[in-house]
Amino acid sequence: MEKDLFMKVKCFVNQRDFSCNVFVCSDDKGAFIVDLGYYDSEIKKYLSSLPELKFVLQTHGHFDHIMGLDSFSKDFPDVPVYIHEQEVDVALNPTNNGSMGMLYSPVSLQITFKTLKEGMCRLCDYDFKVIHTPGHTKGSCMFFFKDQKILFTGDTIIETSIGRTDLPTGDEAALFRSLEKFKKISFDDDVEVCFGHGTSFSYKELMKHNSFLR
């Protein structure tokens, strides 16, 4: 019997603060989240309609991508949250996560992260590749679900542009090295590319319209 590789990706956008995308992915095996930048009753209600929620993946630790984690963890205390091993101190430090001076109340998370490294990863029957792309932050990552043809880029690549490097742990030279690394990876044209901000589109469209990747 052929394995069902269909995965539904629903995007919630934080319209109040910095328009960060929250991706809720689900299939017949369960569900997971990529970048919990906010958490409200709408997201909670949607999660309750899905199969078992397995885990949360964080592409990086900037405040606009992590602001929902503490509230979420109170409702789902047993759901682990994963982030690159070099990004833990970015997420947990209000200066490094960019919230100090940017928000009225700095983001000081009380959760405990589980860590990821570069390479293939298997979590709860989901196989994906962790692509370490430092530059926007030192532990920024992309997550590529090859079988489902979905790529999450975080803020390393955003539609027709790339992430900023003027925040703590940002490194312009490292970002451009990460872009060169990305260009050497083979993706099918119909892979859906999901950015940390903005509208998702295909890998073919990304390579056509993003001049930083030529």
Q: Where do the PLM segments sit?
A:
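Conserved beta-strand hairpin/beta-sheet module of binuclear metal-dependent hydrolase folds
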Residues: 2-46, 142-154, 158
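Short Pro/Gly-enriched beta-strand edge/turn motifs at strand-loop
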Residues: 3-9, 101-102, 124-126
